[in-house]
């Protein structure tokens, strides 16, 4: 009788879908109110003037204007602001 042993199992073979995080509008770009500026987990970038933070830490513009990135404070946190025209 011909026999073939059972193939072994594996714990690999899975991968999660990418979340498309990161900066969506860069410094100097003109944006409209409501535009998403940064998608992030945690506060790598903090909201500055005319920018608010959503419940998933997404930063979005509250006014039309130009995007500005700056490092401020004792710990040099990165802030995203909107400069209105």
Swiss-Prot record:
PROSITE patterns per the UniProt record, alphabetical: RIBOSOMAL_L27
Similarity comment text for this entry: Belongs to the bacterial ribosomal protein bL27 family.
InterPro entries linked: Ribosomal_bL27, Ribosomal_bL27_CS
Highest rank taxon of the organism: Bacteria
Classification via PANTHER family: LARGE RIBOSOMAL SUBUNIT PROTEIN BL27M (PTHR15893:SF0), RIBOSOMAL PROTEIN L27 (PTHR15893)
Biological processes, Gene Ontology terms: translation
GO function term, MF aspect, one: structural constituent of ribosome
SUPFAM superfamilies assigned: Ribosomal L27 protein-like (SSF110324)
Short name of any one Pfam family annotated for the protein: Ribosomal_L27
One cellular-component annotation, GO: cytosolic large ribosomal subunit
Name this protein carries in UniProt: Large ribosomal subunit protein bL27
Entry-linked NCBIfam families: L27
Keywords: Ribonucleoprotein, Ribosomal protein
